[in-house]
Amino acid sequence: MTETILSGGQIEVGEHHTTTWFGMTVNTDTVLSTAIAAAIVIALAFFLRTKVNSTGVPCGMQLFWEAITVQMRTQIESAIGMRIAPFVLPLAVTIFVFILISNWLSVLPLQYTNADGHTTEVLSSAAADINYVLALAFFVFVCYHLAGIWRRGIVGHPVAVLKGHVAFLAPINLVEEITKPISLSLRLFGNIFAGGILVTLIALFPPYIMWAPNAIWKSFDLFVGAIQAFIFSILTILYFSQAMEVEDHHD
């Protein structure tokens, strides 16, 4: 009998490096990726602020982010109106940049081998951790409901959410509203997590051919990370639009 070994490695999916802070279990790899992404966003904001205030020729990075800001502004103008909700623009752009950088960190070829001989990414995508995406989605959930209360009133907003466009569908509208942060987070988590699974499977290829599919997928991963960041920010704008909609109001 001939035995064929298809894989001598071990596939580890969804594993995180954990530690205990103040009695709570913390995924340190997610915290590290999130902190680095936040630091890059803040540094990028100060850099672009300096460029905007200067009188020199705009650099390529400035033009790139200006194009993103214009795109977000157009979406907000058509969905809500900049005069009604100007605060949504910096929020949407910040969320886009933050998620984009978080996703792109995993593309960096930084790996190490642990004591068990398993090769692990130093900077994994924070969006591959369900805690990260749920926290981000619930933050958006709270923000657009606060905006809805500011726009419609503390009584008018809950009534409008339950009533929706068809009053007798109030129970369904309530379930839909509760599931919004779940669907928003799982959409991002599923795509990024699936990418991590594929990279893990590619790592099982023989070393002499592994570089080719890995390079192709890493390139595609840049595109997927950008698309998912854009979708998350666009849905954020859409949820703000729904929460701040007022009947028979003309701007």
Curated annotation (Swiss-Prot):
Task: Give the source species.
Answer: Mycobacterium leprae (strain TN)
Q: Kindly give the Gene3D superfamilies that the UniProt entry links to this protein.
A: ATP synthase, F0 complex, subunit A (1.20.120.220)
Q: How is this protein positioned relative to the membrane?
A: Multi-pass membrane protein
Q: Which family does it belong to?
A: Belongs to the ATPase A chain family.
Q: Which Pfam families match?
A: ATP-synt_A
Its recorded name reads ATP synthase subunit a
A single GO cellular-component term on record: plasma membrane
Q: Which UniProt keywords apply?
A: ATP synthesis, Cell membrane, CF(0), Hydrogen ion transport, Ion transport, Membrane, Transmembrane, Transmembrane helix, Transport
* Disulphide bond pairs: none
Q: Give the protein's function.
A: Key component of the proton channel; it plays a direct role in the translocation of protons across the membrane.
NCBIfam families hit by this protein: ATP_synt_6_or_A
Cleavable signal peptide: none
HAMAP family (alphabetical): ATP_synth_a_bact (MF_01393)
The protein's superkingdom reads Bacteria
Gene Ontology molecular function, alphabetical? proton-transporting ATP synthase activity, rotational mechanism
Q: Which InterPro entries match?
A: ATP_syn_F0_a_bact/chloroplast, ATP_synth_F0_asu, ATP_synth_F0_asu_AS, F0_ATP_A_sf
Subunit text:
F-type ATPases have 2 components, CF(1) - the catalytic core - and CF(0) - the membrane proton channel. CF(1) has five subunits: alpha(3), beta(3), gamma(1), delta(1), epsilon(1). CF(0) has three main subunits: a(1), b(2) and c(9-12). The alpha and beta chains form an alternating ring which encloses part of the gamma chain. CF(1) is attached to CF(0) by a central stalk formed by the gamma and epsilon chains, while a peripheral stalk is formed by the delta and b chains.
Query: Does Ion transport count among this protein's keywords?
Result: yes
Q: Where in the cell is it found?
A: Cell membrane
According to its UniProt record, where is this protein mainly located? Answer: membrane
Q: Where are the transmembrane segments?
A: 28-48, 84-104, 130-150, 192-212, 220-240
Listed under GO biological process in this entry are:
proton motive force-driven plasma membrane ATP synthesis
